Structures are given as structure tokens and as C-alpha cells.
Amino acid sequence: DMAVNIAAGDIGLFNDNAKYHIDRIASLRTVLARINTKGVLGDPKVRAAFISMTDRKAYNEVILKGTFIPGKAPVPPSLDYGFDQLTDPNAYNVDRAKQLLDEAGWKDTDGDGIRDKDGKPLSVDFVIYNSRAELPIYAEAVQADGKKVGIDVKIKPVDYNLIDKMGIN
């Protein structure tokens, strides 16, 4: 018998069990979030802050059970193009994220914990599909990290087939 593509959250069921032999190989598969470059995320400082506020290392360790390598370039670590020598300008750094948002003019003027500018709250939709069990959990982690810097992250589950259409529009 054989199983492939075991969900990250389920791999622990098979570890340390003499009944199972697990072979792991590096994959070209990625877990990514596409960032809209319109609206509030049209500002490069807000985009950089959004990326800097996300603790991708913790997401991998806790949600994905250490089965992925956090990205820092559009090149997967399984390709030998010097991935280990690359730097990550948007590594997890809450203070940097807050500073970038300050520089972009987003402040919490009403004390509700969410930054605002010109009377509008800093709110971002995080669109996910539910066919992969880890995505809602991942989105909730991003939402919690958003609160740390004053971004209201709204989770919007949609059918998988709508994701690409949303990117086109």
C-alpha cells in the first residue's frame, strides 16, 4: 500500500510508528499568498509591512508541522540556485511592519487597535479556499498577526475555482 500527498497536519500520525516507512523528497510545490497591488496594498510600504508581519517560520513549524521551508524568493529551496545565500528583506519583524505602516501614514487615531487613514480603517481581505485543511488555520494566523500591527484581516472563504478568476479581475 502507498499514500502520497499526506496533509502536513496528518504526517504525525505516521511518524514513530514501526508499521509505516515514510520517504520524503523535496518538492517544487509552494504554499503562497498572492498579494493584490491595488487598493491599500497598492502602496509598497503597506505590502512590505503585510509580509513582514507574517511569521512564516512559525506557520511552518506549528501549522504545517515543519513540512515546508519558509520562502524568501520566487525560487523554491529545492532548486540549487543559491537559495540558502539569499536574504529576506521582508523577514518577520513586527517593529519593522509598524514602522512601515507609520511611514505610509496609517495610524490608529481612534484607539480601536486598527490603523486608519483619511477616515478609512486598514482592512485587507484574505481570500482562501477550504479544500486544503491548513488554509483556514493559516489565514487565522495571518489575521492574528495583523492585529499585532493594526491591520484588520478579514478571512473570505471561496470556491477554489474562483481564486484565479479573482486574480484576473
Task: Report residues per predicted region.
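Structural transition elements
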Residues: 70-109, 130-137
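Sec-exported extracytoplasmic/periplasmic mature domains
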Residues: 19, 39-40, 46, 51-68, ...
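Short, hydrophobic alpha-helical packing/hinge segments within bilobed ligand-binding/sensory domains
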Residues: 10-11, 46-47, 59, 97, ...
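Beta->alpha turn/N-cap motifs
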Residues: 4-10, 56, 75, 160
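A bilobed periplasmic-binding-protein/Venus flytrap-type ligand-binding module shared by bacterial periplasmic
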Residues: 27-49, 53, 62, 74, ...
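Conserved hydrophobic/aromatic pocket- or pore-lining residues that grip, position, or stack substrates
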Residues: 1, 50, 101, 126
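Extracellular/periplasmic solute-recognition and catalytic clefts
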Residues: 1-38, 61-62
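Ligand/substrate-recognition segments at binding pockets and active sites
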Residues: 107-169
